[in-house]
Swiss-Prot record:
Sorted UniProt keywords: ATP-binding, Carbohydrate metabolism, Kinase, Metal-binding, Nucleotide-binding, Transferase, Zinc
Metabolic or biological pathway, per its Swiss-Prot or TrEMBL entry: Cell wall biogenesis; peptidoglycan recycling
GO terms for MF: ATP binding; metal ion binding; N-acetylglucosamine kinase activity
InterPro entries (alphabetical): ATPase_NBD, ROK, ROK_cs
The name this protein goes by in its record: N-acetyl-D-glucosamine kinase
EC number: 2.7.1.59
Pfam families: ROK (PF00480)
Organism: Yersinia pestis
Length: 256
């Protein structure tokens, strides 16, 4: 059995897959954002619950919204502060008594799509995740291209392009990013960016679900906001496709 964890800034989801890669069980729980021991306990509890369900110990892999450090085994997870700088792989492996593999979540997503029978004929596949942050994975000839420091494909940390500034206004604040820089596109085209831009333009805070509900009802501010957001998203993604020349792109969405 294969246990695949999707660890995001908002939720952790475990999917259990059989030898035919069919999902047979899954469970979702909130992500503890500040408490590392609690995070480890949740991962351990989910693993043991899956073991009980399957009657065997499955292989464990975790997709994280960040980067594993190849030098010291720690992880860089700006959107999950509880795991930031922690030796997650070694600690969890010790707790559940088996090997644990960790990679960037967008790399995992892109690789799974690239190996789908429908897409195996494509030499290059670009996978993008829009959720709490923005992640990316680049697959060439069936293999992840991650680079020496695992930063290849971290498209969310590109800066806002000029065309996006034309849409948003040259005076749009360069939002501080968890990576330490300002103006990274993940702070504008992610779920939290979607909410932040609404509050910036209308001086009123609403959750994304309410904004979308207002948009569906034809409320003018919400309609203008969603259209502005989609224009910025199109500019950012268009630049990526131009740079990579990728014949196939796949998106994973969790903005609302």
């Amino acid at each position: 059995m294969y246990y695949g964890f999707d660890m995001g800034g908002t939720k952790i989801e475990l999917g259990v897959f059989d030898e035919n890669l069919q999902r047979i069980w899954h469970k979702r729980v909130p992500t503890p954002r500040e408490d590392y021991p609690q995070l480890l306990q949740i991962l351990r509890d989910l693993t043991e619950e899956a073991d009980t369900y399957c009657g065997v110990q499955g292989s464990v892999g975790i997709g994280i919204p960040g980067l594993p450090n190849a030098d010291d085994g720690t992880v860089f997870t700006a959107n999950v502060p509880s795991a930031m700088g922690q030796p997650l792989q070694a600690d969890l492996s010790r707790l559940i008594q088996r090997e644990v593999r960790i990679d960037n979540d967008a790399n995992c997503f892109a690789l799974s799509e690239a190996w789908d029978p429908e897409f195996r004929t494509y030499p290059t596949v670009l996978g993008l995740i829009l959720g709490t942050g923005v992640g990316g994975g680049l697959i060439v000839n069936g293999s992840i291209v991650s680079g020496r420091n695992h930063i290849t494909g971290e498209f969310g940390h590109f800066r806002l392009p000029v065309d996006a500034l034309d849409i948003l206004g040259a005076d749009i604040p360069r939002v501080p990013c968890g990576c330490g820089h300002r103006g990274c596109i993940e702070n504008y085209i992610s779920g939290r960016g979607f909410e932040w831009m609404y509050s910036h333009f209308y001086q009123h805070t609403l959750p994304a679900t309410d904004i979308i509900a207002h948009y569906a009802a034809g409320e003018p501010k919400a309609v203008a906001h969603v259209e502005r957001f989609m224009d910025v998203l199109a500019v950012c993604l268009g630049n990526l496709l131009t740079m990579l020349g990728s014949p196939f792109g796949r998106g994973g969405w969790g903005v609302v």
